[in-house]
Amino acid sequence: MEQADTIIQIPHFYGSLKGMQDKFDKYARQDAFTGSTREEWEAWKETSRETLKDLLGWKYMETCDLAPRVEEVVELENGIRREKVILQVEPEVYMPMYILIPPKQSEEKQKCFLALPGHQGAGKFSVAGRNDIPAVKRMIEFYHYDYGMQLAKRGYVAICPDCRGFGERRDEALQKGTDEKSFLTSTCFHLAHMAEPLGETVAGMCTWDASRLIDYVYERGEWDTDDLGVVGFSGGGMQTLWISALDDLSLIHI
């Protein structure tokens, strides 16, 4: 219902998107691959990756020991073991995750997927299939958000992290106890406002964390890394897109 008595009608708007589109048309695609040999492709790929990392703010990210810590192990009814592990992705910056490990069907190493979360699902809780939490169950039913659990049911190890600002990584603005909206949503908006003046981006931070997660898979050494996969929905899909461009260690991207 319009409330015309409380506002005025704007006859013409002076938005910014047209100017941004013009700028995109002027400057975009200048670094497209134009070679014809494998050697030229490899050289272009490495140069492009460094450019992307610079745009994402990776030069400000700090490496450190992962220092993995197992906080919980739960045996689920379907035979899947759910581990809760905390990783240190930067000095004093921590990433909680669930690892869903199905029963082994052979002596071969199990194949593994990173299952990255998007918005409105409480981070890892939906992806890992926490139907015991009513609000999460509702999001799973609405968005089909439990793709980590679905992978585990099909025999894949599924690593389901909280990306920055989601789940247990929410910052102060949404640390509101039992408030459902705060629980389901994220503080990535607040992170973005802090990151931009530093030359960082939320996409860069999340992609960095995904790369540290890949480091953990290799360091742990229990699973097949020849076909390491990454899957994501919404913001998780964005992370999957970026990580597919930035490294060769993950080969399957959904």
Residue ranges and their predicted role:
Residues 232-236, 240:
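Gly/Ala-rich beta-loop-alpha elbow adjacent to hydrolase catalytic centers
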Residues 252-254:
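Conserved small/polar residues in nucleotide/adenosyl-binding loops
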Residues 242-249:
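Alpha-helix C-terminal capping segments
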Residues 1-81, 89, 94:
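N-terminal targeting or regulatory segments adjacent to alpha/beta-hydrolase or S9 domains
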Residues 115-208:
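Cap/lid segment of the alpha/beta-hydrolase catalytic domain
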Residues 96, 241-242:
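Short, hydrophobic alpha-helix immediately C-terminal to the catalytic nucleophile
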Residues 75-133:
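Glycine-rich active-site/cofactor-binding loop and its immediate structural neighborhood
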Residues 223-232:
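Alpha/beta-hydrolase fold nucleophile elbow
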